[in-house]
């Protein structure tokens, strides 16, 4: 019992340390590698503009989190991607971070609305809406992703696609958008890995052999399962460890919150 409690305390502490380092590092425009949760390792570069829902969140021209366009004026991301007192820039139609390719649409976020129940210790309710100052121009490179049904449940071993510009290994950030296929895991398997710290608003996905995962800089980005935005990249222990799945915000639990928030902030 003491060993299990110590493991759980260590995991919670690691998440707290990560979130603090995330806020400090990105307030200074820095990137940190090898920490918990900022959660692509072992993936592949996608065909240019083949994931038209993908958003890049940037500060001072530096990518730091992902997001997903869910309609022409709103992007969904993780609550821990909020940076206070700093303008968040959203870039849609992005592929190469280092090159202007003519498809990009850039916005200074008009309003960031973090879920009121977000807990930085447990990382519960890790979800945030970003309102754009004008509607995005929808075209082949920029399209919203549909949301799942409220309360929808994914079967174990459902194949999903995570994407982003996060670390590919040894702290190296890629220039081009990458993606990785992962399978959802049973709740019991994931809860055992994280000593019972999962809440009902979280689910997990993993590549069983290890070596593939979302990682530093992918946070807030999409996990697409069954053609819908079922998950938001949230946290995990390291990146691509065989016995530690990535943890994702369960979007189907927030459909009413998303709809009401948008309706109340037109």
Where do the PLM segments sit?
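Active-site substrate-binding loop(s) of clan PA
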Residues: 101, 116-119, 135-174
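Extracellular trypsin-like serine protease catalytic domains
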Residues: 36-41, 54-62, 149, 158-266
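Conserved H-D interstitial segment of serine endopeptidase catalytic domains
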Residues: 33-34, 38-39, 57, 75-78, ...
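Extracellular/periplasmic catalytic domains that process cell-envelope and extracellular macromolecules
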Residues: 46-50, 69, 82-84, 120-123, ...
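N-terminal signal peptide
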Residues: 17-36, 266
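Extracytoplasmic
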Residues: 50-52, 85-87, 92, 104-107, ...
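Classical eukaryotic N-terminal signal peptides for Sec-dependent ER targeting/secretion
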Residues: 1-19
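Catalytic histidine site
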Residues: 47-87
